[in-house]
Amino acid sequence: MKVYKDIFTNDEVCSDSYAQEDPFGNPEFREIAFEVKSNKRIKGNDDYGIADNSEDAVEGMGADVEHVIDIVDSFQLTSTSLSKKEYSAYVKNFMQRILKHLEEKKPDRVEIFKTKAQPLIKHILTNFDDFEFYMGESLDMEAGLIYSYYKGEEITPRFVYISDGLFEEKY
């Protein structure tokens, strides 16, 4: 299994157990980012009702049961709120830091990043109110933000990650 970690904080933020798709359904963004679909799951109930009828099992769930988004729960992501102005300042700094990282570690990615990052960020800024932002476990604002949005009538959000802000670790 591959786990994706933030290049600046080593926060685990995703894994290859989630199918990667084109961000926002746009294949042009695929060279710089990927999108994964989340699911809801039930957390906290020790009695799974294995021997019971499944309808009875749901009725019998205790007060300690909660519905969670799998990605948020598995990787201890925390929602954060930013104004559009704060986000613009953050993303400018973050993109410069990624560019510097690429120049040092992956010079072959520099031109692709320069070409593809701007349209992606423009899309996010244009649709700013549709997004919720998440941070990794360290809650470090130097790390990459994870972008969450709802596609169409889906009941769980999709999460978008900037690929050059991550590295893979195999387990």
Curated annotation (Swiss-Prot):
Keywords: Calcium, Cytoplasm. GO terms for molecular function: calcium ion binding. Residues 1-171 form the TCTP domain. The keyword Calcium applies. It is found in: Cytoplasm. Belongs to the TCTP family. This is Translationally-controlled tumor protein homolog.
